[in-house]
Every structure is written in structure tokens, then in C-alpha cells.
Amino acid sequence: MMTNLNVRTIKGCFPGSLPDALNDMSVINHILSLTGRFDEGQAALASTVNVVYVGTAVYDIPRYREEYTKNFIARGCGISEVCVAEARSTGATPCAAATMVTPDQLQHLAEAHIILLPEVTPFSLYDAGRKRASMRVSGQVAARGVVLVGGGCCFRAEHSDSANPKTCAQYMLSRENEVDSGRPVEMEEGGAKWEYLCVHGLSVLPGIFCPQHSSRDATGLLLNESFSKMLKRHPTERGIGVDCRAVLLLMGDGRYQVLTIANREGRTASVKDINIQIKDVVEGNVQTTTIQQQGSVEELLRKPCGPVVRDPFEAYYAMANPTALTEKLLCAPR
């Protein structure tokens, strides 16, 4: 199900590497500027900015929230959280937690100027009932000019590592306090074989999003090749591949801009590609175009040119990562 929003009016920031982007203060400043409440000359807030964190990819583990929101706090933003797994508020495990957005959480969303949604790694957001409610809410907040920050969660779908056992709830919660870094779990060599999935998102924006597009994973797989292969199974949709050091900024006035994350020690230090590419399947072949540094959103994003194909393995792997309504993933999409 796609929303009927005008993509020209949507404000958003969609990096190839969300952790690296949110550690770059220039990116934070650009995000804040989109709210209309930030004085760029003074590099300070001109009025209150509320950031709502939705921990979709990390099961509401506190250290991820702290890592992703620390620079917004440094700029004086208020932070609220909408818990997806809700394990801490209910005392239940994510497998048995409630899956309804509470009135308080809806109020946080109503007062938000920025909504931060980490990558689409697990399935906790995508239980059928919660997803439909989330789509309605996300569409409403996007329509009123709230800035969306994240990755594939906001698109129709994402090239996702959700089949990786190390992104499942039980594994991540078991190692919740093992490391100090707030970065998501990295893929490791020598584990069980798994494939990248086309995991459906909230459909605020059309297309299939691929983060870290020019990178290789820990097994040596080149993600842009994996993404092209995936698109042949979803030939009606456009792919948007964003490199690790690139950031796609939607200005809300029909324009987009490509930002560059500063080169820094860590994952992106050796990454030289700073591009965003669009990919279309034409007569069975994937055609790739590197977009300009700025341009029209209507030329960047397009609706599917035919029926949308759902990844049949999405439900299969969701059953290996159970949440309260996982079984509803087996129902036909509406």
C-alpha cells in the first residue's frame, strides 16, 4: 500500500550510513535547518525543536538511542521516544510485547518537528497491524512538514540484512550491554548463509532504498551488485542507492540536495565513493544513473510502473525473528 503524499512537499534526510551521518554536525545542522527553527549563522536553535526517536532497527536498546540523538541534544533539541518493542514499558520480551502505539506516543508524534527512524534491520515495526497504523501516522506527520530522518523505513522497501541472525531480537538483546558503541551489529564471516531481503517500509516515499550502496559487507559481497540483482525481482520499482558518505536531503519544496559526510576514522575512512544512484529495470537489464548534486525530486523519485512484487522470503525470515504479530506477515498485503 502506497501513501498518496506529494513527494515534492516531503522533508527528509536519508544517508547511506545513518550512524556516520548523525555523528557529523554539518548534517545535523542541515536537518535542523529543514525545520525552519534553526539559525544557521549562529548554529543554534531559534525556537524549540522536538525530536521523536523510533527505535525500529534496534529494539529500543537505550545505547542506540543515546548514540543517534546525542548531537541533537547538543544543539538543544528535546528528545522523546516511541517504543516499538515496548519490552521495557510492559516488562515483556519483544516476542510478547504489546504492539499498539499509545496515546502518549501519538502525542509525541503530534508535537514532533523531526522523526528519527533507524535502519529497517528487524521486523518489529512491520507486524501487519502496527505497520498499517504506523503508515497512517507517518503519512500524517510527513504531510504537515515534519522532517523524516532515516533510511529505507520511509521508502516502499529497503535492501535489508534482516535475514542475518545477528539482527534478530533475541541475539541483539542478549548482547545489549556488551559493547560501548551505539553502532548496529556488523555482519561477520563464517556464519550461517543468508540473503538480503526486500523488506517493506512505511511507503511514505516510493522506491526501494539501498544504504551503503558502494560498500562490501563482511563476507566480501558488493552491495550494489546484490541490489541490482534484487531489483530484477522487483522490476516495476526504482532503486535508490546511497553510498556510505552520501546523504540525500529532501528540501520540502520540490528540490533535493546531496550532502557529503566528512571523512573520519572508522567504517567510512576508506570509502571514496560519494554518490547516489538511481536504478531502473529496462527490458530485463538494470540501468544505473548517478544523480546530480541537486535537482528535482520528481525526477529522482517515481511511483511503480506496474504491480509491486513482495519478497516471498520476508515472511519466512520474520518467523525466525518472532514478535507479537509476526504471523500476520503471512497475510496478503493490502
Curated annotation (Swiss-Prot):
Keyword Lipid biosynthesis set for record: no
Transmembrane segments: none
InterPro entries membership: Class_I_gatase-like (IPR029062)
Coiled-coil regions listed: none
Gene3D superfamilies, sorted: 3.40.50.880
Superkingdom of origin organism: Eukaryota
UniProt keyword terms in alphabetical order: Cell cycle, Cell division, Cyclin, Mitosis
Gene Ontology biological process terms from the UniProt entry: cell division
PANTHER family: ALPHA-ASPARTYL DIPEPTIDASE, PROTEASE S51 ALPHA-ASPARTYL DIPEPTIDASE
Function: Essential for the control of the cell cycle at the G2/M (mitosis) transition.
Similarity remark: Belongs to the cyclin family. Cyclin AB subfamily.
Designated name of the protein: G2/mitotic-specific cyclin-1
Biological source species: Trypanosoma brucei brucei
Origin organism lineage: Eukaryota, Discoba, Euglenozoa, Kinetoplastea, Metakinetoplastina
Gene: CYC1
